Amino acid sequence: MMADEGIHEPIIERNKRTKAEIRAKEAGTLAGLYVADLLIREWMPGARFTWTSAEGSRIDEGTCILAIEGCRHQILACERIILNILGRLSGIASNTFRWVSNFQIPLAATRKTAWGTLDKAAVGVGGGLTHRIHRADALMLKENDLASTAEEGDEGAVRVRKVLSDVQTESIGAFVTVEVRSLDEALAAAEAWAERMLEHEEGVRLNILLDNMGPELSRDAVLDIETRGLRQYVTLEASGNITFDDLESWRTSMVDVISTSALHRAAPPLDLTCIFEGV
């Protein structure tokens, strides 16, 4: 970010010191302070600053977030970068808070992020779940994984069952997720995993990701798995183009968690401004 502004080393004080404040122009949930704090410490030597609002706090229009004193050149060089960081991450946190406040089923981010872990951290600040931070956290078997792992000719429920039966315990991580797209695949996943847990006395739950199945079909999958006595071996996650306007239709879906990139990809930045003393 600093390189984008042509800045490649810490900015040395070279003119009169001045004071400025970063203020909110709208209400929201504040996030990204730790990132901006590091930027100021590393790139604005000699600057004195105080955070007047805390990470995760709900702020109102006009709230002062940061009071800073440094040379005018330092502040002018860094103000837009600081505003961009705080604006984007606070926007994600605010959007996530809006979703979470209107829904009872836990909501999770996806890995479709522009700023990677920073975006996921902002989702967490807003009250959402981060899901996996990176691939090594948990084993996730999506369509491409299933296609590349299964034997030639295997497809659908047969492919799901075979791949889950062959999963190596040491590669699992915190949990296992398998992506399914039909009732048959969901049931095959639950049955295969239950058989495996009973045979090997393993205690890892399978997370079945119901991809683009919609609320009604997802509910059918949950009920089918429950009816067959397999619910204790799995959790059920719904995902696929779920928007804020869709939430009402998911209230009775009975899934355990909903994941959507709309938490972070559809979040407008929180509107912030930097005001210099005397303005």
How would you label these PLM feature ranges?
Residues 217-218, 277:
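A ubiquitous, low-specificity "background" feature that marks scattered single residues
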Residues 209-215:
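Extended hydrophobic secondary-structure segments
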Residues 1-207, 219-220, 224, 233-238, ...:
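Acidic/glycine-rich phosphate/pyrophosphate-binding loops and surrounding catalytic core
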Residues 242, 263-264, 276:
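Hydrophobic pocket-lining residues within nucleotide cofactor-binding pockets
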Residues 212, 240, 262:
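Short secondary-structure boundary segments
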Residues 273-279:
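Active-site loop ensemble at the mouth of alpha/beta enzyme cores that anchors a bound cofactor
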